[in-house]
Amino acid sequence: MKKRKFGLALSMVLAAGTILGACGSDDDNNTSNEGGGDAEETAGDFTVSMVTDTGGVDDKSFNQSAWEGLQAFGEENGLEEGTSGYNYFQSNNDADYVTNINTAVRNDFNLVYGIGFLLTEAIQQVAAQNPDTHFAIVDSVAEGDNVASITFKEHEGSFLVGVAAGLQTKTNKIGFVGGVESDLINKFAAGFKAGVEAVNPDAEVDIQFAGDFNNASRGQQMAAAMYGSGADIIYHAAGGTGNGVFTEAKNLKQQDPDREIFVIGVDRDQAEEGALSVGGEDYNVTLTSMVKRVDTAVQDISKRAMDEDFPGGEIIEYGIQEEGISIAETQDNLSQEILDEVANY
């Protein structure tokens, strides 16, 4: 019966997402190295690169997950990081997207990823000019027979962490901090709100957007206002901006270790970001995380390209059933009762 409710709730989520409407941190524009090769060859000849959005590969979120997937693929297939294997190009601002993608093409990479919906136009532009190169865009849909579009069912995982938040909250006030307001981030918000309301219709969900994926100070300011208004849980889908939410939660926990205050992480298991020590005792403000397996998707599509099965012109969507969306394995702050209820959905 619960699974039926989940299906109905998700239908409402998609509708809500339409009505309502990953994620990075700032670093210098650079690359790990540059490489080359011919398209669709064996592991020894195959090369692959990715272009980040304005976040770095150490953003503890979306871009980092993609890079970890590329690293895992390279190591699994005996590729070297550098001129003959796998590589990343880091973007410092929007103007770097086309430049970095073109640089990857000039270095003859067989497959070039654009990490994040902000790179959609740049990928389409360069892909149209280079029909013999394979491209993939993450979190968006781009046109072109040589472009694979990788998307996720973010509303599914957001619904589950919403259930957890709705059952965990003591104040019935919950916050959501999004990065740039868009159809994509609205999927997170709508799914989360639906999950909360499914188990706790009395809870209020305050949905706000920072307008930036790369502004930790803005995230901290927003979190301070939400926690100050009585929220005890905030879910962020804001990339590097979300790091500020963790900072504020940890500061408040440092001031009052007995206060129940939590953050729900995104994209990766962000338990490590919530860890702190007060008076020699260890605490963690991460309630759970909505894990979006960008790393898995990058590995999958890279392998298909290497095996001459590149899904150009296709939309590949990852959800719970495809093992592309899940709730984090680190669940120390959730009771077994709450975990059982989440599992029912």
Where are these regions (language model features)?
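Bacterial Sec-dependent N-terminal signal peptides
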Residues: M1-S11
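A residue-level marker of the well-folded mature domains of exported/periplasmic proteins
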Residues: S25-N29, N33-Y345
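C-terminal motif of bacterial Sec signal peptides marking the signal peptidase cleavage site
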Residues: T18-A22
